[in-house]
From Swiss-Prot:
Organism, scientific name: Homo sapiens
InterPro entries: ABC1_dom (IPR004147), ADCK2_dom (IPR044095), ADCK_kinase (IPR052402), Kinase-like_dom_sf (IPR011009)
Protein name: Uncharacterized aarF domain-containing protein kinase 2
Keywords of this entry: ATP-binding, Kinase, Membrane, Mitochondrion, Nucleotide-binding, Serine/threonine-protein kinase, Transferase, Transmembrane, Transmembrane helix
Function field: The function of this protein is not yet clear. It is not known if it has protein kinase activity and what type of substrate it would phosphorylate (Ser, Thr or Tyr). Involved in the mitochondrial import of CoQ precursors, plays a role in muscle mitochondrial function and fatty acid beta-oxidation.
Binding residue positions for ATP: 206-214, 311
Name of the gene this protein is made from: ADCK2
């Protein structure tokens, strides 16, 4: 279905007058608008018209941008004349100009590095310098290429260990966009009276990444949907009723809520471009906005405020990501003809990365993932996720509870009690194993910056319960107050997740069991049988090397706790790359998550034994279906 778009000539001409030629770089930028918003014009009228003219916005999976070209004349019979897009040539000129300018800038950065690549075989120092230059070029190429570098560093079955080690450092703190853009997004999402919903003490963000930036604010709970209040209560460390005197439940505690939660939308039912470009009013099942009638004209009362984190996408991000993905697809097809890298199937890699970027630039995906994790861990008090506060969830803005906690890296330092370190390490490993083998829903971005620790200061060696008395009118109330929040992990940034199909999950369990049993040849057979692509020309040699690798790793260790799984998996990845065996993307993501968590866990507890911890999960099987 071709999406109808209408933009007047006056709007296009106003965009044309607004832009001037930027000297030196030959880039177009707005003369009156803020510099950081120079890409926003693409969403205002030109890109939707060109897309509707040149490409088919089809129904399908999120990774489908436009699989076939259509002619406007062919769409004439699909509906009445008034539904047809009227796209003039001006939009096409703008889009092609932007594409050529962007392609030229990227070519200037990366083509010299491509020409210098043969020199990396001369000496290791030259290779290190080349990787450093590639890293710097990626850092300055925008959010799409930064995310591509971060994702590539997790695919150790495709890229060298030196490349992955270098690009694992690619965590860039981006200069925050101005407050005016944040205010504009808030107004679009929640109406002109958004100040009645959110209160900001400081307009400076507490963090800024390449995709979004985060503010700390306070939200009025009177506008939360019923289900959000219930999830908020379940996820909170609330004291018993004898402390607060509340007897009416959470509904009275947070205020009466008349409207129930809308049914969650199915993002997979909307095509990629529709989700990115259609106005919020046109989104099927969208809960993107709060009508102005729902928002009172007064400031929120202090008694109804809770601390929240407000994540806001950077302006112009959608247009830039769409443009970069298009250029990546073109580049992957050009580079795919080279014999040395043909086995990588670069177009397929770009499609996998496109799925990841779709999840990153639509914050509704992260909200859904957080709610999914909360359901999976509803009976696990030692793991917590921020609670998305609906209806304050849109494509560009996500409001969630603000979790006061400490980064897990703070507990890697000397002076931290050994028992506390050991507990944190065990919590992390058990959490990951549950995600993999029980839930089949894995947080795929588990670097230390996204893992926080809560309640470490509340641990006490005293087990004695303290009684509390309260004289309420003529009634003596005796209660046992709840202790401080227990030690638990808080996971952030759940925009990227990994799930395995049922056959892949069974294969993963079998591979893990074969590693535990020291059956290296069995590991090789399983990997070859379920590999996404393979140009292995020496199958028997691959099996022999894998058997020697696993056997040698087991021989050098007296007990399983001495076996470093991350080192073993790193060697397995080297072998896969040498024999040109490509893993399925989610399979590789989960293996990499195990490597990261085991490395983090052993930095806290050197005696951590992930294989021993995995035995119950491997023997009992999944509790719930994948």
């Amino acid at each position: 279905m071709v999406a109808p778009w209408r933009v007047s000539v006056r709007v296009c001409l106003s965009h044309l007058r607004c832009f001037e030629l930027r000297q030196g770089l030959s880039l177009l930028r707005p003369s009156e608008c803020p510099r950081d918003a120079r890409l926003c014009w693409l969403l205002l009228g030109t890109l939707p018209k060109v897309v509707s003219l040149c490409g088919d916005v089809g129904e399908g999976a999120p990774d489908v941008l436009s699989r076939r070209r259509v002619r406007c004349s062919g769409a004439a019979g699909a509906g009445p004349a008034e539904s047809l897009p009227r796209a003039g040539p001006l939009g096409g000129v703008f889009l092609h100009l932007r594409l050529w300018l962007r392609a030229g800038a990227l070519l200037v950065k990366f083509f010299p590095l491509l020409l210098l690549y043969p020199l990396t075989y001369l000496a290791p120092s030259v290779s290190t310098l080349w990787l450093h230059l590639l890293l710097k070029a990626t850092e300055t190429s925008g959010p799409t290429y930064i995310k591509l570098g971060q994702w590539a560093s997790t695919r150790r079955d495709l890229f060298s260990e030196a490349f992955c080690a270098q690009f694992s450092k690619l965590h860039v703190r981006v200069t925050p966009h101005p407050w005016t853009h944040t205010e504009r997004f808030l107004r679009q999402a929640f109406g002109d009276d958004w100040g009645s919903i959110l209160s900001f003490e400081n307009r400076e963000p507490v963090g800024s990444g390449c995709v979004a930036q985060v503010y700390k604010a306070y939200a009025n709970t009177a506008f939360l949907e019923t289900d959000s209040v219930q999830r908020l209560g379940r996820a909170s460390c609330l004291p018993p009723f004898s402390h607060t005197g509340a007897v009416g439940g959470l509904r009275e505690l947070f205020g009466y809520l008349g409207n129930g939660r809308k049914p969650p939308e199915n993002l997979a039912d909307q095509s990629f471009l529709e989700r990115l470009l259609l106005p919020k009013a046109d989104l099927v099942g969208s809960n993107a906005g709060v009508s102005r009638a729902q928002v009172p004209g007064h400031q929120p009362e202090a008694t109804n405020l809770i601390s929240v984190a407000v994540k806001v996408l950077h302006p112009g991000l959608l247009a830039q990501v769409h443009m970069d993905l298009l250029l990546m697809k073109i580049g992957s097809r050009v580079l795919g003809v080279l014999p040395g890298i043909k086995w990588l199937s670069l177009p397929e890699i770009v499609e996998e990365f496109e799925k990841l970027m779709v999840q990153q630039i639509d914050l509704r995906y992260e909200a859904q993932n957080l709610e999914h994790f909360q359901v999976n861990f509803r009976n696990v008090k030692a793991v917590k996720f921020p609670t998305p506060l609906r209806p304050f969830v849109t494509r560009e803005v996500l409001v969630e509870t603000y979790e006061e906690s400490v980064p897990v890296s703070s507990y890697q330092q000397a002076g931290i009690p050994v028992d506390l370190k050991r507990k944190i390490a065990r919590l992390g490993i058990n959490m990951l194993l549950k995600m993999i083998f029980v839930d089949n829903f894995v947080h795929a971005d588990l670097h230390p910056g996204n893992i926080l620790v809560q309640g470490a200061n509340g641990l006490s060696s005293s087990q004695e319960a303290q009684l509390q008395q309260a004289d309420i009118c003529d009634t003596l109330v005796v209660a046992v107050p709840s202790s401080l929040c227990p030690l638990r992990l808080v996971l952030l940034d759940a925009g990227i997740v990994a799930e395995l199909q049922a056959p892949d999950l069974r294969n993963f369990r079998a591979v893990f069991m074969a590693v535990v049993m020291g059956q290296g040849q069995r590991v090789a057979e399983l990997i070859l049988h379920h590999a996404r692509a393979s140009e292995c020309r020496d199958v028997e040699g691959f099996k022999t090397e894998m058997a020697m690798l696993v056997t040698q790793a087991r021989k050098n260790t007296i007990t399983l706790e001495k076996l470093h799984v991350s080192s073993l998996l790193s060697s397995v990845f080297k072998l896969l790359m040498t024999h040109k065996v490509k893993l399925e993307s989610n399979f590789a993501s989960i293996v990499f998550a195990i490597m990261v968590l085991e490395g983090l866990g052993r930095s806290l507890d050197p005696k951590l034994d992930i294989l021993e911890a995995a035995r119950p999960f491997l023997l009992t099987g999944p509790v719930c279906p994948p």
